[in-house]
Amino acid sequence: MTSFRLANLTVFLVLLFCFMRGVHSADDLSKIPEIKGYELHCIEASGITESSAKKLRNGDDIASPDQSIKCYVQCFFSKLRLMNEKGVVQKDKVLSLLGKLMEEDKAKKLAEKCDLRRTNPCDTAYAMYDCYRQNKAKLL
């Protein structure tokens, strides 16, 4: 993976974890060997287009996300064990990760606010992701 793509993946991971100030945490995540394969695996598994994956990596707003976009996010959440194989959010793991990226009280508030349930795992994952993305400025 080129350094540019790895940098984009790191940016995406930071976005995925609410753009919090723990830059060193994103660097640490990018060094985990499994992370490097997640993007390619999740692109293939979800059927997302390269342009949509790029929008997610860049933190762009996606007005009408299709199922492939939602399932791409769900794939990452599943790989990071933030959701189990049935799409159930693993609250303890979400809190643990958020706690590494921000103050504990902010982590709890964000986890509560973004503990959203939808009709299927892909919709749930995307709703959570979008909540984190929308609330990042309020938590910095």
From Swiss-Prot:
Keywords: Behavior, Secreted, Signal
Up-regulation conditions: (Microbial infection) Up-regulated in salivary glands following dengue virus type 2 infection. Up-regulated in chemosensory organs: antennae, palps and proboscis, following dengue virus type 2 infection.
Domain of life: Eukaryota
Tissue localization of expression: High-level expression in female mouth parts, particularly in the proboscis (at protein level). Low-level expression in female antenna (at protein level). Female salivary gland. Female chemosensory organs: antenna, palp and proboscis. Male antenna, wing and maxillary palp. Expressed at higher levels in male tissues compared to female tissues. Not detected in midgut.
Subcellular location: Secreted
GO terms under cellular component: extracellular space
Entry GO MF terms: odorant binding
Disruption phenotype: (Microbial infection) RNAi-mediated knockdown results in increased probing initiation time.
Protein's GO biological process: sensory perception of smell
One Pfam match: PBP_GOBP
Record has Signal as a keyword: yes
Leader sequence residues: 1-25
Biological role stated in the UniProt entry: Involved in modulation of blood-feeding behavior and capacity in female mosquitoes. Required for normal oviposition. Required for normal fecundity and fertility of female mosquitoes. Required for normal expression of VGA1 gene, which encodes the egg yolk protein vitellogenin-A1. Required for normal female longevity when mosquitoes are maintained on regular sugar meal.
Protein family according to the UniProt entry: Belongs to the PBP/GOBP family.
Protein name in the entry: Odorant-binding protein 10
Species of provenance: Aedes aegypti (Yellowfever mosquito)
Upper lineage: Eukaryota, Metazoa, Ecdysozoa, Arthropoda, Hexapoda
